[in-house]
Amino acid sequence: MTEKKARPIKVVAENRKARFNYSIEDTFEAGVMLTGTEVKSARNGKSTISESYADSKNGEIWLVNANIPEYLQANRFNHEPRRPRKLLLHKRQINKLIGAIEREGMTLIPLKMYFNEQGRLKLELALAKGKKLHDKRETEKKRDWSREKSRLLRARG
């Protein structure tokens, strides 16, 4: 029998601003409940998660405002691009996330959406706290200083 080759991880969408706008406390991997046309459209790589967030409703975690565009080859069976999508997590993880959202005022933001080795669409979620303006400036100053240091060290030799 021939063995199936492991597929490489394919990143579909990434939220690059998340690490700048939020201080990330913890990360989780969650499955996403999708329809067939959503999976095919996500494989095309045109999805965006930059304006999306995760919210809790009735003891479940939902991905809100993520854009998976309509699949061009699907006609009347197409999906709604910005519909809420249920996230698949263990009950213990769901309880931990809901507790952090309600008690500590934290936010659930998606960091990246990718297909794993089995071909399943996964979402990397982060439990994060929003940064204030002065925090953002501080991280920008640190980044600029580290760039300047590396330039000086390269110039010296």
From Swiss-Prot:
Any Gene Ontology biological process: trans-translation
Annotated region described as Disordered, given as residue ranges: 133-157
Q: Which GO terms describe its molecular function?
A: RNA binding
Sorted keywords for this record are:
Cytoplasm, RNA-binding
Q: Which residues form the signal peptide?
A: none
HAMAP family xref list:
SmpB
Q: What is this protein called?
A: SsrA-binding protein
Q: What's the encoding gene here? A: smpB
